[in-house]
Each structure stands twice: as C-alpha cells, then as structure tokens.
Design a protein with these regions (language model features):
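Small-residue helix-packing motif on alpha-helices
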Residues: 32, 42, 60, 196-204, ...
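Rossmann-like NAD(P)(H) cofactor-binding subdomain of soluble oxidoreductases
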Residues: 39, 48-49, 57-62, 66-133, ...
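Internal alpha-helical scaffold of NAD(P)-dependent oxidoreductase catalytic cores
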Residues: 104, 108-114, 130-167, 180-217
Length: 266
C-alpha cells in the first residue's frame, strides 16, 4: 500500500524527518504533503523537498494515511481541535512533541485513534538519528512495524514505555546539542594550539564519529575503550585526569538530569 504521508508543522525536527523520507527509494514525493503556518514557508518546503505543501492543516488531515503532528507542544491542542473530525479513521497519527502524552492526545481527539508517540533527534536528517516510539493500544503489530520502517530511514529506534520518554529525551533527544558543544570546545582547543579552524573542526568531528562507531561496533564498555587509549604516564591520561578534576562526568550527568526534569514539568 502506498500510504499518503502528511506533516502538520515542519520545523527543524520535521525538516530532518522530511529530508530522510524524500531520500527513500520506496516513498514517492507525490505521496507526501506538508502544511506550514505561512505561505512563504510552504513555498520553501516545496522548493527544497519537491513535495506538495500548503498552509491549510485540514487539507493534510483529510489526505494523510500517516499523519505526523510536528507542531510545537503549546500548539498541539489547538491543532487537534482543528483537525480531529477530518482525520481518517484508520490513519496512523504520529506525534513528535516533547511533553505531550498519549493520554492527552487521545483526550483531545475525543475518539478512538491509532496513535504512536515518538521522539526523534536531529541526526535523523542524515539517517543517523536515534528515536523512541510508543504505540497506543489501537496500533496493530503490522502498523507498528510500518512505523518502525519509517524510523529506520531516520537511523535507529527503540520501542519504549512512555514513562521512559523523559530519560530518552535527556539522553538522545537533546544530546546532539551537548555533543556539538563538545566538538566546538575541542575545535577551539585545536585553534588555541595553532590549527586552522576548519581543520580543527574536521578533526574533532571525525574523532567523535569514529569513537561512537568504535563503541557501537565492538560492543566494548566505553570505560574499557577509554583505558585502551590511556598509556601509563602518557598524554591521554593527563587529559582524562584534568577532565575528572574539573567535574566532567558530574557536569554531564547533572545536565542530563536537568533536561529530564524539564521534560517532566512541561
């Protein structure tokens, strides 16, 4: 079945996901429709991605077999009120909003719906995202597998209980920002040590990518991999000790906890 895929809202995360979908060999651009708030942004979506775009949410709601709700959380209730009577009965509704629960969405629709709450992250735009998905009780196994096949286009995914979404948001949803800060700090250090800035960024980025890939492909504990780099009395252990002395681990743990707390209180 060639399902029609709709997006209501297309901010940074929506664009990351849309970008992955239009690159997929088995999804036609003719089967994707996007609504945005302004005519200018709709035209930009059409120009950049080659998909049908509109400013009319109801148009997307009527057409979509798979409906991504990609608006900001504080617009969610308003958008659902606008489209709830127009969505197809068998449509799979996919939420990507942080802090908006399955129960809230079901309550706002006020009827039985097929719903999957998800949380992707921005590396989805290059096919290296990490997403969490949580289906409601109306989603069949085949439908969940289909949603999973979409999220495989964005990278990898895990089916999680909704109670674990706060931890996931802190660990994966927001963590690209932490990693980019780390890359920036490493590159700044490289510049301070005399490297050209472009080369410093390239080196830092590849170091992060390679380290993550090494951990994933070897399955070794990161602590073991760290120890393998540290020679007795060498340069690496000197840097590691300085990071420990300055509270590197505790700073990261505290930041992740703060992020999770914010998610719980949204």
């Amino acid at each position: 079945m060639n399902r029609k895929i709709g997006f209501i809202g297309c901010g940074n995360m929506g664009k990351a996901m849309l970008g992955a979908l239009v690159k997929a060999d088995n999804i036609s651009n003719d089967n994707i429709i996007v609504s945005t708030k302004s005519k200018a942004s709709a035209e930009k979506i059409n120009d950049e991605y080659g998909v049908k775009s509109t400013t009319v949410n109801s148009e997307v709601a009527k057409e979509a077999d798979v409906l991504f709700l990609a608006v900001k959380p504080y617009f969610f209730k308003e958008v659902i009120e606008e489209i709830k009577d127009l969505v197809k009965d068998e449509a799979i509704i996919i939420s990507i909003a942080a802090g908006v629960t399955v129960n809230q969405i079901e309550e706002w629709f006020g009827k039985e719906i097929k719903l999957v709450r998800t949380m992707p992250n921005t590396p989805a735009s290059v096919g290296e995202g990490m997403s969490a998905i949580c289906p409601n009780g109306n989603i069949t196994e085949n439908e969940l597998n289909y949603v999973g096949s979409l999220y495989n286009l964005f990278g990898k995914y895990e089916v999680l209980e909704e109670k674990d979404f706060h931890a996931f948001i802190a660990l994966c949803g927001s963590s690209p920002a932490y990693v980019f800060m780390f890359i920036e700090a490493m590159a700044d250090a490289g510049v301070k040590l005399g490297l050209p800035i472009a080369k410093a960024y390239k080196l830092a980025e590849q170091a992060i990518l390679g380290s993550a890939k090494l951990a994933l492909e070897t399955g070794k504990h990161p602590g073991v991999l760290k120890d393998e780099v540290c020679s007795p009395g060498g340069t690496t252990i000197e840097a590691v000790i300085d990071l420990e002395k300055n509270g590197f681990r505790n700073t990261v743990i505290s930041a992740v906890e703060k992020c999770a707390d914010k998610s719980k209180n949204m």
